[in-house]
Amino acid sequence: MISKAPARICLFGDHQDYLGLPVIACAIDKYLTVSGKPNQTDLLNFDLIDLNRIRSININSDLSQIEKGDHILFVLKTLKSHGVIISKGYDIKIKSEIFINAGISSSSALIVALINFFLKIYVPEKVSTKYISELAYESEVLQQGGSGGKMDQYSISNGNTIFLETGVNNNFKKIKSPFKNFIIANSGVKKHTDEILFKLKIKTLDAIKNICNHYPTLKLCEIKESQVNDFREIIDEKSFKYFKAAIKNHSITLDALSELEKDKPDLIKLGKLMIKHHNVLKNRLRITVPKIDRMIDLAKKNGAYGYKIIGSGGGGSILILAENKFQQKIISDLKKMGVNQIIKSNESPGILDL
């Protein structure tokens, strides 16, 4: 049995999913692969190839006390809570093409691939990718007390490019993407995802809570950019900055959706919207670091028509959109800057079974 789950990039809507606002995200054709076969023991033997580690877990292990970040055990706990009981041992290999701790969801890919692996073995009927998304979200966020939203799990499980409404219903629709040959470059600056997400989430939610105390029926998704200053007197200046950034990013995401749904989307217009989104992340939420800023400046000077930081920020990767004739120069100059992990990728259909 082989289960493959892709990386993901957020095109529009970073730092929106945990607010219940929509995102546009894309699964890309770089994969984490889980492969395995049964053994004659009660052990799940994990060969973590990229980490050069072997880990063995007894299928009867107590799962009541698990350290946060132990994604394998949390997957087993989540599956068990949904009636998926692993009844025999397996020798399992895990190998990945996905940059680790770089903003393209290596952890979520691991969780989705493992869940899909065990569901294929123990659940005879076909399950929906939305169900896998929900199990992955439960395992990574709810069980572990994480601060993220549902973008990663839904994007990876369902594949392609999706517009995801991250409110109560988690409705999503697939969008035909005009983008080809993404450049993704990892800064190598280690980030602390949950800490960053928690801080920004708390600040923004506090601002929204204070506003809703004055306007109990108000819905964040219904606030227009033109209305933002109406709320300035209700909250302090710092909170207002985060609130304003959330509304701006929401507006950009909806504008991008409108363009993407056209028969012939304008790539230059989409690139400009992406740059606007990046500028909010950089200047209002302040999630970039100096190396990321230098990488972005390099892409801009070398002809990129779109660019942004990917993920929670504080390090990680950038996404670059550029015509083919500019791509090699961008990649070459990034390498000269000391950026060692650079890939070109395209859209992925999502989970693969082999």
Task: Locate the predicted segments by residue.
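C-terminal nucleotide
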Residues: 1-10, 33-70, 78-81, 155, ...
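Gly/Ser-rich oxyanion-binding loop with an adjacent helix/lid
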Residues: 1-9, 18, 67-177, 300-301, ...
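Cytochrome P450 core scaffold surrounding the K-helix E-X-X-R motif
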Residues: 14-15
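A generic structural signal for short coil/turn motifs at secondary-structure boundaries
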Residues: 20-22, 100-104, 191-195, 282-283
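Structural signature of FAD isoalloxazine-binding scaffolds in flavoprotein oxidoreductases
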Residues: 20-40, 158
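FabD-like malonyl-/acyl-CoA
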Residues: 109, 317-321
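Glycine-rich phosphate-binding loop
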Residues: 314
